[in-house]
């Protein structure tokens, strides 16, 4: 005799996901931290369903309310209901098992679909998948040859193509097409639908291909240390930008990569080793304690400090994230300290790139403004000019001589993560504005 629905347990995966969602909503805890703390479920599956909920939360909650799912079933755990509805409408489109909650949600399927349809859910098209060639292990020619033999077709633009032409071409990539980036050599662009394909690809696992958003590649591109230079990466973990700098330098010279957290330091060591970075010297320590005596020959510095992360497109949020002025003030203070230390502590430094994955001016233009006031021996270079003027988004014009020279990557218009970049150069003796 078959079991009654009340006696059939909800699958562990659904219960674990609902537990995480409940903690995130009620305690405003970080979803990713909660996922990695969950020991009894498949983390990839948890991540997928919660991301779908994050992307469609307004429509899902409206559908649940309009159909009376929770009102008609008062004993139904709201978090579990949200997870099951997410899976049914936006995930695998089916539910496992015959438990009472699963059967209940299935019985509401048509009503839920009608509500979603009436709501007119308009999903934002995901940005493309960026894949960077790690030239320590694999050349551009080898990568292009591999793609050609794998039946990928390269979409090419004329030499005089504008940035607008480039963005239009990305949006119209056919399923089997890819492009090379307009700004960063070795960055390949694929349609968004292939994101998971590359996550599992052997070339990625062997570190010959690196999954790195184009926006974060601009830091090494703008810093542009030559082969043989001495570079300091002050806040280096997990190490993707360090590897890219190593590629720019053709694996010749020296890169000091600094990280103060033990776990992140170990990740930095592992990534740079696996990526074939012969010139990287990982250092466990605080960037603010770095001295010119220990690093006398530093010429180029990357400053990529802790920030709010407000520009990151892969963040999962299940509650509104208001601008937290107190937190931004603390972050700004730390950012000013680190960037100012980079400017003042190393006598042979020529160029500094400052980068955040934030879209808040408190962490960007205001930090640049204060550090230039504290360190008049430095000047701003134009990031837009460094990209041959093939860029649209610059800083706030309310910051004279700063806004026009700094650069923003905006998710909607640049099809990347949200990133801010500023480029500083040491003045020659006697040089003035």
UniProtKB/Swiss-Prot annotation:
Entry superkingdom: Eukaryota
Positions of the catalytic residues: 357 (nucleophile)
PROSITE patterns found in the cross-reference section: SAM_MT_RSMB_NOP (PS51686)
Gene disruption: observed consequences: Increased lifespan and stress resistance.
Reaction(s) the record says it catalyses: a cytidine in 28S rRNA + S-adenosyl-L-methionine = a 5-methylcytidine in 28S rRNA + S-adenosyl-L-homocysteine + H(+)
SUPFAM superfamilies for the chain: S-adenosyl-L-methionine-dependent methyltransferases (SSF53335)
One Gene Ontology molecular-function label: RNA binding
GO cellular component, one term: nucleolus
Gene Ontology BP terms: defense response to Gram-negative bacterium; positive regulation of innate immune response; rRNA base methylation
Binding site for S-adenosyl-L-methionine: 235-241, 259, 286, 304
Entry's EC annotation: 2.1.1.-
UniProt keyword annotations, A-Z: Methyltransferase, RNA-binding, rRNA processing, S-adenosyl-L-methionine, Transferase
InterPro entries: MeTrfase_RsmB-F_NOP2_cat (IPR049560), MeTrfase_RsmB-F_NOP2_dom (IPR001678), NSUN5_7_fdxn-like (IPR049561), NSUN5_RCM1_N (IPR048889), RCMT (IPR023267), SAM-dependent_MTases_sf (IPR029063)
PANTHER family: 28S RRNA (CYTOSINE-C(5))-METHYLTRANSFERASE (PTHR22807:SF4), NOP2 YEAST -RELATED NOL1/NOP2/FMU SUN DOMAIN-CONTAINING (PTHR22807)
Family: Belongs to the class I-like SAM-binding methyltransferase superfamily. RsmB/NOP family.
Function according to Swiss-Prot or TrEMBL: S-adenosyl-L-methionine-dependent methyltransferase that specifically methylates the C(5) position of a cytosine in 28S rRNA.
Protein name in the entry: 28S rRNA (cytosine-C(5))-methyltransferase
Organism: Drosophila melanogaster (Fruit fly)
